[in-house]
Amino acid sequence: MRVIIEKPADGDEDEIIVRCREPDDEIMSLIYSIAAGRSKLTAYSEDGIVKLSPKEIFYFEAVDNKVFAYCEKQVYEIRRKLYELEVTFENSDFLRISKSTIVNVSKIVKLVPYFNSRLEAVLENGERTIISRQYVPDLKRKLRVEEDRR
């Protein structure tokens, strides 16, 4: 696959053109990632209301009927349901890893085996989160992890 970047003429808006014989999963995932990356989420904190880019978010977590977005150093309330975020970001780097958590897989630096066939994900900011065994196969597919067949 070739990638060509051209500067548009003055006054023209940015555009992305995809030329392919058949849009496969990889190309569609790339398109969805670009679209999701440009969208902003409204987030609330004690300091006020901010707009968050999805790439700033490490994970979402539902606690006591509220959903929070965890960024590198700040936590924000997101006034949407976890399942809505899952649908919004289903073809991007976000993946549900438990009943209450959706993680940005691009922020995972290490996966460590955990009790009862679960995994522990270590994120770029040092935080750790548990991947329920029910979601481990989805994560491995997303990360294209090969099974060790000894």
Residue map of PLM features:
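N-terminal regulatory/sensing modules of transcriptional regulators
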Residues: 1-26
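A broadly conserved detector of short glycine/acidic/proline-rich loop/turn motifs that flank catalytic sites
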Residues: 9, 22, 47, 82, ...
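Short, highly charged low-complexity linear segments
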Residues: 13, 124-128, 143
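Short, structured patches in soluble enzyme cores that scaffold and shape functional sites
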Residues: 20-22, 125, 133
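Conserved binding/recognition cores within well-folded domains
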Residues: 26-124, 128-130, 150
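Solvent-exposed, charged/polar functional surfaces in cytosolic regulatory/catalytic domains
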Residues: 88, 138, 142
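Short, charged, intrinsically disordered terminal tails
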Residues: 141-150
